[in-house]
Amino acid sequence: LLSMVRPLKFILKFIFVTSTLAFIAGVAALYFEKQNQTVSRVYNELRPNLIQGGGQQCLSAMSTAGIKFVSLGDVRDKNCLIKNAIRINTLPNTKLSSPLTLNCRTASKLVTWLDEIEAKSIDHMGTYNCRKMRGSPIMSEHSFGTAIDIARINKASIKKHWDNGGVEGNYLHRAAKSAYSHFSNVITPDDNALHHDHFH
């Protein structure tokens, strides 16, 4: 009988310990979820106020540079806001796969960068899109018109050529290095799997 009691005590102790750990883990998960919700809510509310659209000075500079665009003013949609938004259908030196909708300041930086890397054409996967980041409650920079996803520059495909070490791959790495001097945030395939086929 004694030999049966000891295993029973062990089993009961094991159940108690695992139940306690599960409870603690559950409480911790709820805490961090609440913290994450609080942080994301504050960020989502404050982020639009920190964005600079460039104002009339930016619009004038774009016109002087020969950029054809449509001024959209401030574009609001739910929690999203583009300050001083513009839509660009064509660029003087770079063929676009589709029109761009960005805030003027970001568009100006993009045009300068494309000219610097001698981009004759780009295929992009989108600019403005009122959505959250994948797997996060925080709004994406696309929600504020401050981001573009580029899949191809000239004949160089990010998905096909980034890791091949050839002419196209070397060009893409130089282009990415150049982008860091123009944009505060640049994401490449080296950063995570979500960007295996494009620059952000």
Predicted regions and their residues:
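Non-membrane alpha-helical secondary structure
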Residues: 3-4, 38, 50, 54
